Amino acid sequence: MSHTIVTEKCIGVAECVNACPVSCIHKGEGKNTINKDWYWIDFAACIDCSICIQVCPTKGAILDKEEPSLQRKLR
């Protein structure tokens, strides 16, 4: 199972990108609905290590489950 970044809660800090050991977190195009940069997780590459959840400053922005409907890849 993979993790999910909730697109509309992401504030674009990108601590998850730097912390991910397999580089499966990517920047999305444009801004989300709160006018912030946003990131998405490649479900196929995620190793479910939970480091992204630990470093994310926004509670609830990264879920410990795969929820494609909450995470978009492109704007």
From Swiss-Prot:
One GO MF term attached to the UniProt entry: metal ion binding
Cofactor note: Binds 1 [4Fe-4S] cluster. Binds 1 [3Fe-4S] cluster.
GO cellular component, one term: chloroplast
PROSITE patterns attached to this UniProt entry: 4FE4S_FER_1, 4FE4S_FER_2
Keyword vocabulary terms for this entry: 3Fe-4S, 4Fe-4S, Chloroplast, Electron transport, Iron, Iron-sulfur, Metal-binding, Plastid, Repeat, Transport
Positions annotated to bind [3Fe-4S] cluster: C10, C16, C56
Domain 4Fe-4S ferredoxin-type per the UniProt entry, residue ranges: 2-30, 37-68
InterPro entries on file: 4Fe4S_Fe-S-bd, 4Fe4S_Fe_S_CS
Cofactor: [4Fe-4S] cluster; [3Fe-4S] cluster
Positions annotated to bind [4Fe-4S] cluster: C20, C46, C49, C52
Cellular localization per UniProt: Plastid, Chloroplast
Main location: plastid
Pfam annotation, one family: Fer4_7
Record's keyword annotation contains Cell membrane: no
Protein name (record): Uncharacterized protein in rpl9-rpl11 intergenic region
Species: Porphyra purpurea
Lineage: Eukaryota, Rhodophyta, Bangiophyceae, Bangiales, Bangiaceae
